[in-house]
Amino acid sequence: METLGLPFQPSRPRRNRRNAAIRGLTRETRLHPEQLIYPLFCVDGAGIEDPIGTLPGMSRLSEDKLLDEIERAWNLGIRNFCLFPMVQDHLKDKTASYSWSEDNFYLRIARSVKARFPECSLMSDVAMDPYSSDGHDGVVTEDGRIDNEATLPILARMAVAQAQAGFDWIGPSDMMDGRIGVIREALDESGHQDTGILAYTAKYASAFYGPFRDALDSAPKSGDKKTYQMDPANVTEALRE
């Protein structure tokens, strides 16, 4: 074979592709059920399985139905679950106080899941919008601004309540500046040093969130989220976030 006088043979990467066994041996990425995260939408009550029209195949589930669904997924090898609450309007207020209430059905469901499936990995959602009467991820001022600093202690209190309920991972999805440090400090000070933070580091002000907000009935009552979520036109900004 002509090698153009080079002291080495040309690369022949096809050697590692010539049969299924070799391809399997050299495969870098393998996807297994235990690597998947199953998002589940929960509501208060019993016997509820409410289909979500904008998310075909998904339903809002009450505690009993959700536990049954987790058992079905568990038997398929799925071990990681992320819970999202749909909160009734009468429980919402401007400071999202229901998010850390002892009567919060979301926290109760988390405790039930961990009691029945103690080896599962359970992930939460930390943001004000499911609990806020304004439908925003932060405190809304009288002139319509999102108050970043007033929001941070609320997120921290929410995160601690979720850790106490048994969540293994806290998932801040609010896009407030500085929230990770504040949440980490609050978790550590409350004895939850082992609770992880799995944050939404790059969340865009995108129409693609429409079906999700419909699932949780958490769309903003006024304005939009463009002052705290990222501009979809900016790619490199995600690295800074």
Regions found by a protein language model. Give the residues of each.
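Acidic, Ser/Thr/Pro-rich intrinsically disordered transcriptional activation regions
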Residues: 14, 21-22
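Residues that form generic nucleotide/phosphate-binding pockets
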Residues: 25
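Alpha/beta enzyme core
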Residues: 2-7, 11, 19, 28-38, ...
